[in-house]
Amino acid sequence: VLDSFAHADIGPVDSRAGRIIMEAEAELEDAVPNISMKYDKDLTSDEYAIKAVECALKCAKPSFANHKMFVNELGENYVLASCYNGLALGGGSYTLCRLILGGIAKKSDSIDDFKNNKLPYVMDIMARYMDARIRFEVEESGFFENNFLAKEGFIYRDRFTAMFGLVGLADAVNILLAKEGIEGRFGKTENATQLGVEIMDIINDFNNDHKNKYCEYTGGHFLLHAQVGIAE
């Protein structure tokens, strides 16, 4: 397993194993594996949560994930990968592609052009690209017939989905407002925050309207994925 994808989950209930893991990580201060704490105020004791906070202050992990939210969306048998990506236990993501919103905003003439032309155009291309990758993986690659993990029953094709990612919402909002000569900064002014919400609504509606037959575990839709940042 590549370092970037080596991940462990603890919680939501207190456990000896979870405590040992946090004690070891606080002492070692290593980067691998990444760790998430499934946190639920009704299941996670304050003492256990404080232990996790103390560990995070020393080694920047675990991250805290909203257990109730993930259970509501994916059921009890879910796991977390790379901090906050909820996926089915025994499943995974066929692919992860990203809308670089700041780049799309730079190529847009106005907020209206971004919303009604440039963003829909790029979303359509990315969705069709993801569909093609998924079709190849399932129908041609032989991965789910021949991979060791599938043969041994660790992963199942029908528990897989894909992640429709995005990065740079704040960049996009700030760029678009500047193009229109409107004052405002994402996260600081109401008009900028509202524009961000409108952009996310457009992306969410597109994703809900798009169907992929091999993403049946998530209702035939991709999962939206928010990227923290991107190098280029």
Task: Pin down the residues of each PLM region.
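Contiguous, well-ordered alpha-helical segments that form the cores/surfaces of helical PPI scaffolds
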Residues: 162-175, 201
